[in-house]
């Protein structure tokens, strides 16, 4: 059984003939428009003229009327319209339009016809809107057959009052998605539509009936029901759709939640295919608890070899580090025995090689072992490092201050064991001052005679004058002293003078090697590489 009510007045339809509810006035407007069209149609107006004895010549005296278009000849409607337009145009041209307009209300019939057409279309559109918004409630039994419950109350409007009606979520028909997040009537405890019930939790929602039980709609346009974008009929429960099955809590929120929540696919296909919020159980993973020493060692050296408890081999070939470079062999023993021996001697058990069977482990202070390996790498790097040739650019018109800076830089380079190339460039008419440049070069060589030795006299190569200097004299003595100082400190470290090698200052070692002075000299070279040119007196 189907009962109807009006969306505008909150009252049920009266009787079986009252189909449209508040659409009755609209039907009256539609009928009025149709009546206007009938009364003021061209054929009825022509018959009216004939009944009153009015001839068309009296209406339009300036226009000859064909006999085929006179009243009573039943001309075709389109021919009469063509003649009427032509007659009005001629009457306007002959200044007889006033007579035709005020002598007889002929033009008013056209206005009434247009008004009737507009009223008819308006009434028809409003009537269709009323039919579309008509609310039909179908109550289905468990078997799917319609049944009207006894004592059913008249249908209530979905909103208590127009003021309480919430703003639609989307600009779609009122029967589609305006109440998309409302809970089904069985769980609704709040009278206000447009939001979920206050007393319903997610646990209760997860216990709703399955999707198969909701294939028969409880309501066509009730909360979230209606027709989706694909033309499928949606059930009254907005959290369950006709297709698919609920996966978890809030599995299908009507429009699929295609905005990125859950696994919705967006608005492209009927508001997507919402798969909801999968409930994932949080599993606490057991994390290995490291001691403070192990954490400190791991942070200090992430590339450290396996040592102490990290060694998992059951049998080990054990050796002990002995000062002097030779290792003492202790034989094969179990992992537990090796760990106990390392703990007794307060040193580390480091896995050295896994190529043998059993693997080789060494009892050694790992910090000292790491320091020695890094030191060997530095020594090999120094032996293979080629001393660079430092170039100093001067000018034949260099000032005294800039000259002193260049000499100071040259001394530091020579003390560091570097060769020096002093260059002086001549451009254009400056070639006439080559002899002045040679004098500057000779002066430069004499001021550095105690530190460096020139390979040859200054040579002119292209546009440049070149002077090469090699360390000699005092520079060689300084180099020898620095080398002896480094050897002395290295021997002291090997003898075990530094027990706490975890906190060795690497910068100190770099300063001892003289690299700090070289960097300072390079900075000075960059600052004054070009020099300040002082114009010479002519």
From Swiss-Prot:
Main function: Involved in chloroplast protein synthesis. It enhances the poly(A,U,G)-dependent binding of the initiator tRNA to chloroplast 30S subunits.
PANTHER family: TRANSLATION INITIATION FACTOR IF-3 (PTHR10938), TRANSLATION INITIATION FACTOR IF-3, MITOCHONDRIAL (PTHR10938:SF0)
Keywords: Chloroplast, Initiation factor, Plastid, Protein biosynthesis, Transit peptide
Subcellular location: Plastid, Chloroplast
Residue range covered by the transit peptide: 1-140
InterPro entries: T_IF-3_C_sf, T_IF-3_N_sf, Translation_initiation_fac3_CS, Translation_initiation_fac_3, Translation_initiation_fac_3_C, Translation_initiation_fac_3_N
The keyword Glycoprotein is annotated on this UniProt entry: no
Region (Head): 141-290
Protein name listed in UniProt: Translation initiation factor IF-3, chloroplastic
Region named IF-3 like: 291-474
GO BP terms: ribosome disassembly
